[in-house]
């Protein structure tokens, strides 16, 4: 179980998270949601120990950092680096000392199987610079899968990709959760959260709500977090988990300490 207790984080002289407490049970599929600048990615990076808490504690239960796989935002990765898909996957997953040493047979089989899972079969030798945005994101998922981690942390896994790729990769996430893995994802698209994530954590610097997604995404919680609707009924649509693809939500304001 992941336990966050009285977590406060100051980032660039701003308070990014203010006295957050929540728990994530083993095997949960959880979305972290909130407006831009709410502290979603900050919370994920604290779980990854990339950012240290100013005050408070984070415990990973029985697991160590070796049991965690992290999927970063794809926009933070240089796609022009001269490296093949299989080299990129193995370097990130196994921290190889050299991109170009020969693969073991076991490594090659794991890479090939992961690429089949994300529908990139046969693309091991392709340069990453040749991949489309959706293919690049599928490759990042493959790198995450071969780590065999028990806890998966994903930062905006569906940003800037098409709807079909999002659906395909959501199926991969659900498969991981069905295998007993704990999956925590920072999410921007509330319609996907409403459709696929049983649990959610809503933050707006402070914790607004956490628990069952249908309860967390109630209109008064979203409004308290700083969301506003283009159309008044959209909050009710999310709450009812009905026709979520038609829901339009936008943050009330922009911040910069995410």
Language model features with spans:
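Helix-to-loop junction immediately C-terminal to a conserved catalytic motif
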Residues: 48
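Catalytic Walker B motif of ABC-type/P-loop ATPase nucleotide-binding domains
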Residues: 152-156
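H-loop/switch region of ABC-family ATPase nucleotide-binding domains
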Residues: 187-188
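H-loop (His-switch) and adjacent beta-strand-loop-beta switch element
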Residues: 200-212
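ABC ATPase nucleotide-binding domains
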Residues: 214-258
